């Protein structure tokens, strides 16, 4: 935040780092580096906190650990409850209860926006049937090997923003030997492979939230080294098509949580 100008913080109950993040944010506020309004804080109700009572307590815990009166974005982290089978019908009922809690907390001012994470098209379609307040976003894994075409189309049709985590395929897509086209395009555009993958997501209308614990990489992700060509595109049509074709060439690959089996 102090060196790279980071203003978006993505955390979750299950990450167990909210207290440290809250302390760092308040230190930056105290030192005059940022104001609370400058920082966009996202947190998530965990699979251990599904259902009316647990979700309400979960939100209280998030605010307490972060030391804030509100978060800018509050998400349901996962469409199933912990310790329930993925195929249990109880998951749908607990999702609905949890969403009602998020709607209430939005009304109370404890969250500025609410959304979901790791929801499939079926989960979103079900949610939209009963939601009084529509989810602002769905945070999911999305990259050229797992492009989420159907989900992106559904979200676009229903006004739900897709937010991509794991834009680098858990780091696998940065392997030049395994996926040479990413690095070839990086050489053509005179930027890093990571910047190519982030730009691919942005060109698809997806928000990207790369993470790193390495200061140099954090700076790299935010730099504008990828310049637009004479046609105004940051990736040429041919370059984008090469990236789009990776899932067909190598087979779709999912590296993170898979919610496809959750009822």
Name each model-derived stretch.
Residues 79-263:
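Beta/alpha (TIM)-barrel catalytic core signal, keyed to glycine-rich beta->alpha loops juxtaposed to Asp/Glu
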Residues 35-49, 73-79, 141-142:
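A short, structured active-site edge motif that brings together acidic residues
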Residues 9, 71, 114:
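Glycine-centered flexible beta-alpha turn that most often forms the glycine-rich phosphate-binding loop
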Residues 2-3, 22-36, 63-68, 128-131, ...:
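Acidic (Asp/Glu)-rich catalytic clusters
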Residues 55-76, 104-108:
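CE4/NodB-like, metal-dependent polysaccharide N-deacetylase domain
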Residues 44-53, 85-91:
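Active-site mouth loops of central-metabolism enzymes
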Residues 1-39, 169-171, 262-263:
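N-terminal binding-site loop/beta-alpha segment at the start of enzyme catalytic domains
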Residues 1, 51-66, 122-125:
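Short, acidic/polar
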């Amino acid at each position: 935040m102090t060196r790279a100008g980071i203003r978006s913080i993505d955390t979750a109950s299950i990450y167990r780092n909210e207290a440290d993040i809250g302390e760092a944010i308040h230190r930056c506020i105290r030192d005059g580096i940022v104001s609370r309004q400058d920082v966009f804080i996202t947190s998530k109700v965990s699979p251990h906190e599904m259902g009316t009572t647990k979700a309400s307590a979960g939100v209280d815990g998030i605010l307490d650990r972060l030391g804030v009166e509100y978060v800018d974005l509050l998400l349901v982290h996962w469409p199933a409850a912990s310790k329930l089978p993925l195929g249990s019908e109880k998951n749908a009922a607990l999702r609905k209860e949890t969403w009602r809690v998020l709607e209430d907390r939005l009304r109370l001012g404890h969250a500025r926006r609410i959304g979901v994470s790791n929801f499939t098209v079926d989960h979103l379609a079900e949610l939209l049937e009963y939601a009084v307040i529509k989810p602002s976003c769905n945070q999911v894994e999305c990259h050229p090997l797992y492009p989420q075409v159907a989900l992106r189309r559904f979200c676009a049709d229903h006004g739900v923003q897709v937010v991509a985590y794991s834009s680098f395929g858990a780091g696998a897509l940065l392997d030049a030997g395994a996926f040479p086209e990413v690095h070839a395009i990086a050489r053509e555009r005179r930027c890093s492979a990571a910047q190519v993958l982030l730009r691919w997501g942005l060109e698809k209308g997806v928000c990207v939230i790369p993470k790193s614990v390495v200061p140099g990489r954090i700076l790299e992700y935010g730099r504008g080294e990828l310049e637009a060509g004479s046609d105004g595109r940051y990736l040429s049509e041919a370059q984008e098509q090469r990236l789009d074709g990776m899932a067909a060439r190598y087979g779709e690959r999912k590296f993170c949580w898979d919610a496809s089996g959750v009822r």
